[in-house]
């Protein structure tokens, strides 16, 4: 019997995955202590910023102190500070200047500029990597590392505003794909830079059709368009086009409305990993194949607060730390981050 030789990547994937699994377990087993440490580091790092001075961070010693001094804000309420950062002012929401702005739409005053700092950027990349490595640690599957991986994302071409690069979060993250994945990554840089989405999807279809695709990742609506174009061109199910496609990674929206459609498009079972990325931070990922739900990332430069959803608009609604939440209750999530968002309501 002829045994298939394993690649170096495949051989190294399992021990690396086990190492990351241990690291994640260390902080996830101690959620309260982990969040307390993050809270203290955030407050300590921002005491000399304009926001920190305005809210007397130097006298904040406990979470109760923070609740008294820092009200919950959405983007519109925080915009007076963000505008100063956008104009190039330093030490406003976080020390120094951000290295990027993630530009998103959807506010009454136009585009939102979400700061990304040198402290927060690594967590956007690390979280996605760790989600895949925990999958390896749990399942033992590593074959996919030998194939091609596609990450459907926005253009990596960035604009500049007062010396700070800005673009879509997915386009910013494209600049941080690890070197060991560069040869496996698709589409090509040139195709990824195509601005027109219709033309981009068509180019991606042409590039990927002859390849050994093993991981496909993206926002479900984008991936659906890609799958439908592949099917239109070949008349085949995705699982038949890409025989070794066995891992689908998705996030950004609720997947349930897409599930039946995707099962039909793919035509066979594939493993999947759900992610919860946002411009404001990478909040969670699915860490177990046999369980629904995601692991909240408590050690990623983000301090979480929660308000019961049905009480959120009440005058006396109570803000809760991770120690006070209950399973099965719907909450509005409030975040403070090492990118300079403070008691920020992301709207989820």
Residue ranges with predicted function:
Residues 86-102:
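Conserved pre-ATP/AMP-binding loop-to-beta segment of ANL
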Residues 101-115:
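Conserved adenylation A10 loop of the ANL superfamily
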Residues 117-138:
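Conserved structural elements of the adenylate-forming
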Residues 55-59, 144-147:
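Short coil/turn segments at secondary-structure boundaries
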Residues 1-58, 66-73, 80-81, 88, ...:
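Active-site glycine/GP-rich loop and adjacent strand/helix microenvironment
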Residues 135-179:
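Conserved AMP-binding loop of ANL adenylate-forming enzymes
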């Amino acid at each position: 019997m002829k045994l298939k030789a394993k690649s170096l990547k495949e051989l190294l994937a399992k021990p690396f995955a086990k190492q990351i699994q241990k690291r994640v377990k260390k902080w996830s087993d101690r959620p309260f202590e982990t969040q307390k440490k993050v809270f203290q580091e955030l407050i300590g790092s921002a005491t000399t910023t304009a926001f920190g001075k305005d809210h007397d961070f130097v006298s904040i010693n406990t979470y109760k102190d923070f609740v008294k001094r820092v009200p919950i804000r959405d983007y519109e309420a925080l915009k007076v500070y963000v505008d100063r950062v956008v104009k190039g002012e330093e030490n406003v929401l976080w020390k120094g200047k951000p290295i990027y702005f993630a530009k998103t739409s959807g506010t009454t005053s136009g585009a939102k500029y979400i700061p990304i700092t040198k402290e927060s950027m690594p967590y956007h990349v690390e979280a996605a990597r760790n989600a895949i490595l925990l999958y390896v640690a749990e399942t033992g599957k590593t074959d996919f590392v030998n194939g091609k991986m596609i990450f459907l994302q926005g253009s990596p071409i960035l604009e500049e505003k007062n010396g700070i690069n800005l673009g879509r979060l997915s386009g910013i993250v494209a600049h941080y794909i690890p070197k060991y994945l560069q040869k496996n990554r698709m589409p090509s840089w040139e195709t990824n830079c195509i601005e027109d989405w219709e033309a981009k999807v068509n180019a991606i279809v042409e590039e990927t059709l002859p390849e050994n695709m093993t991981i496909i990742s993206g926002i479900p609506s984008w991936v659906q368009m890609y799958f439908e174009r592949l099917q239109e061109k070949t008349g085949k199910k995705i699982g038949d086009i890409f025989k070794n496609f066995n891992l689908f990674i998705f996030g950004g929206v609720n997947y349930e409305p897409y599930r039946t459609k995707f099962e039909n498009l793919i035509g066979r079972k594939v493993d999947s990993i759900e992610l919860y990325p946002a411009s404001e931070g990478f909040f969670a990922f699915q860490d177990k194949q046999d369980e629904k739900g995601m692991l909240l990332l408590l050690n990623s430069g983000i301090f979480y607060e929660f308000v019961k959803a049905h009480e959120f608009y009440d005058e006396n609604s109570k803000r809760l730390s991770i120690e006070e939440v209950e399973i099965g209750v719907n909450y509005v999530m409030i975040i403070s981050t090492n990118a300079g968002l403070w008691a920020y309501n992301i709207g989820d």
